């Protein structure tokens, strides 16, 4: 049985004033308010979402 790779993401900037698609990406990652943390599976789709909003989040 293999372990799934995980990645933790923290929202460090508010998505207010950003594009609607970027706000939707933040919600899609399970992030709500500033400093909220979400632990997700490390997949190419999740990596792409993190890359899209890299100016709003921090990988921890």
UniProtKB/Swiss-Prot annotation:
A GO BP entry:
translation
Domain of life, per UniProt, equals: Bacteria
Q: Which UniProt keywords apply?
A: Ribonucleoprotein, Ribosomal protein
**Ribonucleoprotein among the record's keywords?**
yes
Q: Which GO terms describe its cellular component?
A: cytosolic large ribosomal subunit
Q: Which residues form the signal peptide?
A: none
Provide any one GO MF term from the record.
structural constituent of ribosome
Q: Which Pfam families match?
A: Ribosomal_L30
By sequence similarity, the record places it as follows: Belongs to the universal ribosomal protein uL30 family.
Q: Which NCBIfam families match?
A: rpmD_bact (TIGR01308)
Q: How does it assemble?
A: Part of the 50S ribosomal subunit.
Name of the protein this chain belongs to: Large ribosomal subunit protein uL30
Gene it is expressed from: rpmD
